[in-house]
């Protein structure tokens, strides 16, 4: 299994629709020449953007977090260019980009160091072979202060690994519960 390069990522995005919308280079400034947290193609990965749809966790109902019986009541929906995450809390968001993962590829997501150095951790599970959809992102604010996430800027990097052998059963074959997800998707059992 080997990690894939910028050339491969560009080819797969442009010819196979693996990433949509796709940025072939690294974007570091907006149209007004203001600095951004970078996104787009890097040497051995793709830096994704966070869309402007957020679900911010709140415990106004004194609920218990149960992945088998998760309630949307635990979140406040926000549509904004920024998301303020309360201290020691978290928020869900989604990528701007829609992914279509090839059958021979496993994709792993890592948080960007810009956020990690501020105590904001990005968590995403692997994107399995033949999975497609918007990626649901989880941002944990590990600090005792409110933390800010910027929409339409880089938040995490996707690394693509291609196997020497194609899997026998893909996520698509199994009819995975998150197949084709759009928007911020809560846990399903």
UniProtKB/Swiss-Prot annotation:
Keyword field contains Hydrolase: yes
- What GO MF terms are annotated? dCTP deaminase activity; nucleotide binding
Pathway-wise, it operates in: Pyrimidine metabolism; dUMP biosynthesis; dUMP from dCTP (dUTP route): step 1/2
Task: Read off the InterPro entries from this record.
Answer: dCTP_deaminase (IPR011962), dUTPase-like_sf (IPR036157), dUTPase_trimeric (IPR033704)
Please indicate if the UniProt record lists Cell division as a keyword: no
- Write down the chemical reaction(s) this protein catalyses: dCTP + H2O + H(+) = dUTP + NH4(+)
Q: Where is the active site?
A: 138
Locate the residues binding dCTP.
Answer: 112-117, 136-138, 157, 171, 181
Lineage, top-rank taxon, reads Bacteria
The Enzyme Commission number assigned here is 3.5.4.13
Transmembrane residue ranges:
none
Task: Extract the CDD domains matched here.
Answer: trimeric_dUTPase
Please name the GO terms of the biological process aspect recorded for this protein, alphabetically. Answer: dUMP biosynthetic process; dUTP biosynthetic process; nucleobase-containing small molecule interconversion
Q: Which Gene3D superfamilies match?
A: 2.70.40.10
* Keywords tagged on the record: Hydrolase, Nucleotide metabolism, Nucleotide-binding
**What job does the chain carry out?**
Catalyzes the deamination of dCTP to dUTP.
Checking PANTHER family in the record gives:
DCTP DEAMINASE (PTHR42680:SF3)
Family the UniProt entry places it in = Belongs to the dCTP deaminase family.
Q: How does it assemble?
A: Homotrimer.
Entry protein name: dCTP deaminase
Species name for this entry? Saccharophagus degradans (strain 2-40 / ATCC 43961 / DSM 17024)
Q: What is the lineage of its organism?
A: Bacteria, Pseudomonadati, Pseudomonadota, Gammaproteobacteria, Cellvibrionales
Gene this chain is encoded by: dcd
């Amino acid at each position: 299994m080997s990690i894939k390069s910028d050339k491969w990522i560009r080819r797969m995005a442009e010819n196979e629709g693996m990433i949509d919308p796709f940025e072939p280079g690294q974007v570091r400034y907006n149209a007004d020449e203001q600095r951004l947290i970078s996104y787009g193609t890097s040497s051995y990965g793709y830096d994704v953007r966070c869309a402007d749809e957020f679900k911010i966790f709140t415990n106004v109902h004194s609920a218990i977090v149960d992945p088998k019986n998760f309630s949307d009541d635990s979140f406040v929906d926000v549509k904004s260019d920024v998301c303020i995450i309360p201290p020691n809390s978290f928020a869900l968001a989604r990528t701007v980009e829609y992914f279509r993962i090839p059958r021979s590829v496993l994709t792993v997501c890592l948080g960007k160091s810009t956020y990690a150095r501020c105590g904001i951790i990005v968590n995403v599970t692997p994107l399995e072979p033949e999975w497609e959809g918007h990626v649901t992102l989880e941002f944990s604010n590990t600090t005792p202060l409110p933390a800010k996430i910027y929409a339409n800027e880089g938040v995490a990097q996707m690394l693509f690994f291609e196997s020497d052998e194609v899997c026998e059963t893909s996520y698509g074959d199994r009819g995975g519960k998150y197949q084709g997800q759009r928007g911020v998707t809560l846990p399903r059992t």
